[in-house]
């Protein structure tokens, strides 16, 4: 595919690998990735949260088929999770999740639904560096 250049390339796999301890239960890395995806889809693709929920099983299937088998080839793996992002993403999603509770449960997103409303509202924008990867999702 790369015309022999693969020997000169360095593979890097970047994704959320962390989980969040919610005091008795855990938000998984997949649930955290859903939060990122839902906020980004709403902000940059004009897609409502329910559209992202409907696509989520297909997205996860694509990861399983086309990403997971190859990520072990990466020379470096980077966990892109930021400790403060859950609070920000959950605040942005909070008003819409209860409306889609049944669909979220059906998509395996119970943890995201359970986390709704558990985070304090904060004025976060002044504290996020301009170069932060979080801007890819929140704008």
Locate predicted features.
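Conserved NTP phosphate-binding and transfer environment spanning the P-loop NTPase/kinase superfamily
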Residues: 1-139
């Amino acid at each position: 595919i790369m015309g022999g250049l693969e020997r000169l390339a360095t593979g890097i796999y970047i994704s959320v690998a962390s989980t969040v301890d919610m005091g008795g239960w855990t938000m998984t890395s997949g649930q955290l990735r859903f939060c990122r995806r839902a906020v980004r889809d709403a902000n940059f693709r004009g897609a409502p949260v329910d559209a992202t929920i409907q696509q989520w099983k297909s997205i996860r299937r694509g990861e399983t088929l086309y990403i997971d088998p190859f990520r072990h080839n990466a020379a470096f793996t980077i966990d892109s999770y930021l400790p403060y992002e859950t609070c920000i993403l959950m605040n942005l999603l909070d008003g819409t999740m209860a409306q889609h509770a049944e669909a979220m449960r059906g998509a395996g997103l119970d943890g995201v639904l359970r986390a709704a409303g558990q985070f304090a509202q904060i004025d976060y924008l002044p504290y996020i560096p301009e170069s932060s990867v979080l801007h890819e999702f929140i704008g």
